[in-house]
From Swiss-Prot:
InterPro entries xref list: Hist_DNA-bd, Histone-like_DNA-bd_CS, IHF-like_DNA-bd_dom_sf, IHF_beta
Known function: This protein is one of the two subunits of integration host factor, a specific DNA-binding protein that functions in genetic recombination as well as in transcriptional and translational control.
The organism's place on the tree of life at top rank: Bacteria
GO molecular function: DNA binding; structural constituent of chromatin
Similarity comment text for this entry: Belongs to the bacterial histone-like protein family.
Protein known as: Integration host factor subunit beta
Length: 94
């Protein structure tokens, strides 16, 4: 689902809110999560999951095009861990 599709579904579910209000709310939520991660904070949405940063150590990588070794510096990457309720909802036993 894209951000636009999410806004359309929210608009259909909440007809009293304008499309612009929904767009602003979705953008604000994503911005708050991004700012928190940028500040090194963890964001937890109970029952859904948590967003945090994982730190990657510097390592020796390889350029896939040339095969040359490349030194990759340390970096932080966003990480999402699903909560118990979300895991239970998507774990459909066939």
């Amino acid at each position: 689902m894209t951000k636009s599709e999410l806004m359309e579904k929210l608009s259909a579910k909440q007809p009293t809110l304008s499309a612009k209000e929904i767009e602003n709310m979705v953008k604000d939520i994503l911005e708050f999560i991004s700012q928190s991660l940028e500040n090194g904070d963890r964001v937890e949405v109970r029952g859904f999951g948590s967003f945090s940063l994982h730190h990657r150590q510097p390592r020796l990588g390889r350029n896939p095009k040339t095969g040359d070794s490349v030194n990759l510096s340390a970096k932080s990457v966003p990480y999402f861990k699903a909560g118990k309720e979300l895991k239970a909802r998507v774990d459909v036993q066939a």
